[in-house]
């Protein structure tokens, strides 16, 4: 289970390409690249940006908790629900 906000942010960041986040070779692109490679720490502004990109994961990203009835889930919750809804479930 991912418990640290930085770990949760990096998990979401891993699902994106750098071009999803910024224009190639821009200052922001290099910043995201450094974060992804582990040579820079993620800051509040990047956490906010990930929250805008993944609005359904916003609460989980900040708190580590989910509220499915409010549409606030996590990647692992969504993955488990997809498997349950699949044709070979159960």
Residue ranges with predicted function:
Residues 1-24, 59, 88-89:
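A short, Lys/Arg-rich alpha-helix, primarily the initiator
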Residues 4, 42-45:
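Short, conserved clusters of charged catalytic residues that mark active-site
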Residues 24-27, 55:
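A short, basic/aromatic helix-end/turn motif that makes direct DNA contacts
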Residues 26-42:
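Recognition helix of helix-turn-helix/homeodomain-like DNA-binding domains
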Residues 45-60:
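DNA major-groove recognition helix of helix-turn-helix/homeodomain DNA-binding modules
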Residues 59-90:
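Short, charged recognition helix plus adjacent turn
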């Amino acid at each position: 289970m991912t418990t640290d906000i930085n770990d949760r942010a990096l998990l979401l960041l891993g699902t994106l390409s750098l071009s999803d986040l910024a224009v190639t070779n821009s200052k922001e692109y290099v910043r995201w690249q450094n974060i992804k490679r582990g040579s820079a720490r993620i800051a509040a502004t990047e956490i906010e940006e990930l929250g805008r990109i993944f609005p359904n994961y916003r609460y989980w990203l900040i708190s580590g908790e989910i509220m499915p009835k409010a549409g606030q889930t996590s990647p692992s919750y969504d993955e488990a629900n997809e498997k349950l809804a699949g044709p070979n479930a159960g």
